Amino acid sequence: MWGQPPSAVRSSAARPLLRPPPPPPLLPLLFYNAQVKIWDVIIVGGGIIGLSLSIALRKRGAAVLIVERGEPGREASHAAGGMLVDCLIETPLALQPLATASARLYPEFAHELEIESGMKVDLRDQGTILFLSPEHAARNSQLLVCNSLPIPLAQLEPALADHQLPVLYLKERSVDPRALTAAAWKTAKNRGVDFSSGDEVTTITITAGCATGVTTTKTAFRAPKVVNCAGAWSGQIGPTNVPTRPVKGQMLCLLMPSRTLLQHVVRAPEVYLIPRSDGRLLVGATVEEAGFDKRTDLATIQRLHRAALALVPKLADAKIHDDWAGLRPGTPDALPILGATETPGYYVATGHFRDGILLAPITAEVMTAVIEGRTPEFDLTAFSPARFE
């Protein structure tokens, strides 16, 4: 359905000029290109959601431009843990079909990115050990029966301390979000997606009631379709109310004394642990209403560190490698915002909160259908931007 890639606009004068035309004004190259180039779709935001969508659209032949306020993949995607959690205990009921479908897509999604980028994304399928609080256990007794440990906990993960909490074993995967996003960025570039980085969108351009592009702090870009994938910043642009807010999460990274010390993702009421294949161990994470503040604080990092040591005492020998904070895009009802808006040509794919990494493949799939005017495989009514009008 998409046309040819953007090309320069050529003059079609009716008669030859009597004298040479005056030279064009000395405009920045980026501005000049924006005047003579029209994309099929402009995506605002270069996190994993925007990158995945751009790849899906390019597969369908669309000419795509990603406009990113910083560097692609350096905000929430960079700070994420990468647990591919589709367990009903923690997933809102309305989101469960999308979460389950996206988790199933992940092996193919990750493999494709690895093949096309030549990079590894560290997709692991060792599973998750989940310690439940008494309250969660009482509400999910059936899950305790269906997801019991395959072998005693002391054999499954010997480094774990003894615990009295109910425990589940979940066949979940994990992925390295930084590696995943880097691979998606390279894949998008290899497929011909255009990028404008360090370029903050200030407004969506509206002409005759329809979206026709974006205006940035540097210039303007044109396209008949614009998708807001700006994460925690989504509410700051566009003609439609997009009530996202930043939800801060602090994490730290330990270097395990042995790469085999911990093999499974471990989730407990106070902390979660995510081992990487290279011996790193991510420890997270807080959920804080702190505006756009991305600073870490020592007391919080120390609290997370103590919680990790309580789960795995041998981590006392682990070195602290790094700590950071990221801003997840939260929404009033804890559900993503996916779909077309009341402004023709303007779409939204944001508000994934803690599930952006998990939901990237399915978001790309359903939003590509919506943008092309096809009916998506899943009912998106619960995620419609119109629910906030």
Task: Give the location of each predicted region.
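Intrinsic, low-complexity polybasic segments
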Residues: 4-5
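C-terminal catalytic lobe of FAD-dependent flavoproteins
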Residues: 318-389
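Active-site substrate-recognition segment that forms the wall
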Residues: 55-60, 82-84, 119-124, 225, ...
